[in-house]
A protein has these predicted regions:
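Hydrophobic faces of well-ordered beta-strands that scaffold small-molecule active sites
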Residues: 3-9, 32-34, 57-61, 85-87, ...
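Metabolite-binding pocket within alpha/beta catalytic cores that recognizes anionic/polar moieties
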Residues: 29-84
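C-terminal helical cap(s) of enzyme catalytic domains, especially alpha/beta-barrels
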Residues: 96-102, 106, 205, 218-239
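Glycine-rich phosphate-binding active-site loops on the catalytic face of alpha/beta enzymes
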Residues: 80-93, 184-187, 195-227
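Acidic (Asp/Glu)-rich catalytic clusters
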Residues: 19-27, 45-54, 75-79, 101-112, ...
C-alpha cells in the first residue's frame, strides 16, 4: 500500500472505535490514524490491539516540546511499531532531529521498522489571514508551508502533512521520495466542516499526494465500508 487511504479514528474510546471497525471485513487491510483524544484515553495498549488485527497505524500526536523531551517521547513511540507519526516543524531543526533520532532508537530497541516521521506545516484548519494575524507570519501560506517542508527534509523527517494545494510547491523544493500526506479530504457531496483547504480524493491524487487521511466522510457515513470503498476507488482511479 504505497499511497494509502488512512481512516481517522476520531472516537472518544475503544468501545466506539471497535463498534466502527466491526463494520469492515476482518480481512480488510486498513490503515488507521489514532489522534490525541483516543490515544490519551486508551494508551499504548490500543496500538497493540490494532496491530494484532493487522492494521497499519498512523499515530498522530504532533509532538512539540524541547528537544530532549521530544527525543525521549519519540523513543517510546518508536518502540510501538507504528507506521507514521507526527511532529511540529515549528519546533525547529534541533527538535526535529532529536525526534527523528529518538524514533529510530526506539524502533531499534524493539526490533521493529522505524515509523515515517511526518512534520506538521500549517494545520488545514488555518487560512492565510489567520496565519498572518495570529502567528505574525508575513509570507503567504504556501511560502510558509514550503519553508517548513524544506526545514523538515533538512532535519531528517520523511515527509510532511499538508493540504493537497501545497503539494506541487513542496515537491518542487524537496527530494522525490519526500512524502506529502494530505488530510482535509472531502468527497464532492460532503460538507467541509472545519477543514478550510479541503479537496476531493481525485483532486488529491491528481496533485500527487502520497496518502490521504479521511475522517467524517467515512466514520459518520450510514455505511462506513461502502463510503471507504467509494473514496478508495476515486483515489485509485488516477494513475
Amino acid at each position: 500500500m504505497t499511497n494509502p487511504v488512512i481512516i481517522a479514528l476520531d472516537f472518544p474510546n475503544w468501545q466506539k472505535t471497535d463498534q466502527f471497525l466491526q463494520q469492515f471485513p476482518k480481512d480488510e487491510a486498513l490503515f488507521v490514524k489514532i489522534g490525541m483524544e483516543l490515544f490519551y484515553q486508551e494508551g499504548p495498549q490500543l496500538i497493540k490491539t490494532l496491530k494484532a488485527r493487522g492494521y497499519r497505524i498512523f499515530l498522530d500526536l504532533k509532538l512539540y516540546d524541547i528537544p530532549n523531551t521530544v527525543q525521549s517521547a519519540m523513543t517510546v513511540i518508536g518502540q510501538l511499531g507504528v507506521d507514521y507519526t507526527t511532529i511540529h516543524a515549528a519546533g525547529g531543526q534541533t527538535m526535529l532531529q532529536a525526534g527523528a533520532a529518538g524514533l529510530k532508537a526506539g524502533a531499534k530497541q524493539a526490533n521493529v521498522n522505524p515509523a515515517k516521521l511526518l512534520a506538521i506545516t500549517q494545520l488545514t484548519s488555518t487560512n492565510e489571514a489567520q496565519m498572518q494575524q495570529e502567528q505574525l507570519v508575513s509570507v503567504s501560506l504556501p511560502e510558509s508551508v514550503a519553508h517548513y517542508a524544506q526545514l523538515a527534509q533538512q532535519s531528517d523527517c520523511d515527509g510532511v502533512i499538508c493540504s493537497a494545494q501545497e503539494i506541487t510547491t513542496i515537491k518542487s523544493k524537496t527530494a522525490t521520495d519526500f512524502l506529502c500526506v494530505t488530510p482535509g479530504i472531502r468527497p464532492a457531496t460532503s460538507q467541509n466542516n472545519d477543514q478550510k483547504r479541503a479537496v476531493t480524493p481525485l483532486e488529491a491524487a491528481q496533485m500527487h499526494s502520497n496518502g490521504i487521511v479521511v475522517g467524517r466522510p467515512i466514520t459518520q457515513a450510514s455505511d462506513p465500508y461502502q463510503a471507504y470503498q467509494a473514496i478508495k476507488l476515486e483515489w485509485e482511479s488516477f494513475k
